[in-house]
């Protein structure tokens, strides 16, 4: 494991959230936000309304900027995010995780918790200087983000669909050149 479990989950959640904005947008309803929330084991306050959905959707470009920034820019963004949220890191334990960090109260708005948890995860990325683990999908027609947690740093595509599309295109190109 490259990072602690909570860091990896926070990064995976942030990448999934950012990628939900790629066409077709997959975060257009409160039900879809509920699915995202459950998929990444978020806990705490949920308003479950359109205002919460709109706030989370508006966060996507902010997180994209953070996750695609260089090291020095990331530090500035992380510090601003944590200061704006009044973050105070504390160790907590709740199901399904053992001891891990939360930096805002569980009753903070979901958008604040997402922002702060992503910023806290990026602290580990900055400290380990592992920015090569974050990138943009190698598919020319896709702008999705890639989080590469593989041991050999081999992940190039944001999804299986993008990887398969490129494998098929490469196969067809090879077959076409044989004729």
Which residues fall in each region the model found?
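Glycine-rich loops and low-complexity Gly/Arg-rich segments
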Residues: 116, 126-127, 161-163, 171-172
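Cysteine-rich micro-motifs
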Residues: 153-163
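Short, glycine/charged-enriched secondary-structure capping and boundary segments
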Residues: 152-153, 173
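Contiguous alpha-helical segments
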Residues: 172-179
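Short, non-ligating residues that shape and space the ligands of small metal-coordination modules
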Residues: 148, 164, 168
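Short helix-coil boundary/hinge micro-motifs
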Residues: 1-148
């Amino acid at each position: 494991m490259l990072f602690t479990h909570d860091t990896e989950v926070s990064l995976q959640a942030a990448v999934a959230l950012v990628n939900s904005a790629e066409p077709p947008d997959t975060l257009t309803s409160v039900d879809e936000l509920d699915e995202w929330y459950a998929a990444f084991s978020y806990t705490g306050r949920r308003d479950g309304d359109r205002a919460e959905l709109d706030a989370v959707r508006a966060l996507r470009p902010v997180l994209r900027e953070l996750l695609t920034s260089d090291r020095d820019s990331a530090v500035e963004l992380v510090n601003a995010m944590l200061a704006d949220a009044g973050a105070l890191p504390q160790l907590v334990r709740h199901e399904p995780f053992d001891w891990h960090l939360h930096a805002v109260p569980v009753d903070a708005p979901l958008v604040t918790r997402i922002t702060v948890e992503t910023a806290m995860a990026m602290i580990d990325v900055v400290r380990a200087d592992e920015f090569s683990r974050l990138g943009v999908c190698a598919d020319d027609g896709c702008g999705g983000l890639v989080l590469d947690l593989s041991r050999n740093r081999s992940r190039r595509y944001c999804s299986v669909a993008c990887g398969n599309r490129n494998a098929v295109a490469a196969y067809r190109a090879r077959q076409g050149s044989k004729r």
